[in-house]
């Protein structure tokens, strides 16, 4: 079973392009777009580890939401932000996707897949939130956390 229910987190972190910030704040929600879930990390340490294994690996292959083989493009930290969000309570919609691996895989691969699976958590549907903060990605990748409060349209 690839999906397992997860407890409701008190806060989550979401990597997105800066160009998306205005519409996210207008909506007061993270939209799932072409996937069944929208994805988050439960801590900045998990976010950094997740980024190091995904978006920071230019050219690394991955499977997109539709099962299409893709490759990570060059990551531009100045074009992205990390949003720290307080989810509005949505019982039962949080899931963890356990990385699928072939039967009889070497123990090292099993361990790597299990560790990767713990880095992210999915929310089924669009996630409404409150108390948003925007974290500068370039500074974050250099070890500094520079954040600012941002307000949704309904909070203004």
Where do the PLM segments sit?
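ADP-ribose/NAD+-binding catalytic cleft of ART/PARP-like enzymes
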Residues: 1-39, 52-55
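Hydrophobic beta-strand residues in large extracellular and virion-surface proteins
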Residues: 12-13, 24, 37-43, 81-85, ...
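Short, charged/polar surface micro-motifs in flexible loops or helix N-caps
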Residues: 18, 44-47, 88-92
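Short helix/loop capping segments that flank catalytic or ligand/cofactor-binding pockets
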Residues: 23, 48-50, 94
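Segments that shape or occlude catalytic/ligand-binding pockets
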Residues: 32, 47, 107-108
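A generic structural motif
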Residues: 36-42, 110-115
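Short active-site loop/helix that positions an aromatic residue
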Residues: 44-61
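Active-site and NAD+-binding cores of ADP-ribose-processing enzymes
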Residues: 58-156
